[in-house]
Amino acid sequence: MNMERKDAIRSAYRITGGNNFYDGMITCSTLSGKAVCRLVWGMNKAECDAYLEKALSGIPEDFSGKLLEVPVGTGILTMPVYKTMPKANITCLDYSPDMMGQAQEKASHLNLNNITFHQGDVGALPYADGTFDIVLSLNGFHAFPDKDAAYREVFRVLKPGGTFCGCFYVTGEHKRTDWFVRHIYEKAGFFTPPYETASGLKNRLEKMYTAVTLGTVKGIAWFVCRKEVKPKSDSLDQAESEDKEK
């Protein structure tokens, strides 16, 4: 990501504010948010920015195709990015109308006219096969109750040759994070087991996609991968079958 785009995104973040607790935590930008990032995730602001930049690296800076973001959450992570993508056709979906409402407000504040918002379930996406050039998922898969359905639906709506990129929590990378997830976040209903490990996620993605790039920053895995132009018809079924045998 070049400096011009970074400056544009940073400027947009100032417009959206992000001064509530959730936005401050997810961006590690407020005093309370930085405290949570350090305590729960063992991360500082630079590390939070690093995994997000890697997760977004699958989106070309001149992107003008169709992009699906699921879940969009409050939009604090992506509305500023979308401000730099005026030619893109963007669809944002979230199961929570409250979260999505906050994203819509941010889009309105930034005068974004190329975004459509839908309330819905990632396990049953209301889109035709091969609709999107890119599917982006930031910090969502660890919360999805039916992760197999989510993987299947993302694969289905992505065009052959399209990019799937994003990030989410993986277990086994940071002990303190694992403890908080198990004892606090699960009980609060924010996270839903089972969780991927970094190696398990890489294996899963490599069975479904090609050109898989994956890394971790503490307990967060980021990834970028591409759906084959002519994918094997049984690639998804094979991946699911092997996962069930484990």
Residue positions per predicted region:
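Short glycine-centered segments of the SAM/dcSAM-binding site in methyltransferase folds
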Residues: K66, G161-T163
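A short SAM/SAH-binding and catalytic strip from SAM-dependent methyltransferases
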Residues: I134-D146
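Core SAM-dependent methyltransferase catalytic element
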Residues: K207-K246
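C-terminal alpha-helical "lid/dimerization" subdomain adjacent to the S-adenosyl-L-methionine
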Residues: T16, M25, A35-W41, C165-F223
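A short acidic, Gly/Pro-enriched loop at the edge of an enzyme's catalytic core
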Residues: G123-I134
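Conserved class I S-adenosyl-L-methionine
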Residues: N2-E61, P80, R182
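A short glycine-rich, Lys/Arg-flanked "PGG" loop and its adjoining helix->strand segment in the class I
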Residues: D148-P160
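Class I SAM-dependent methyltransferase SAM/SAH-binding core
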Residues: K66-A124
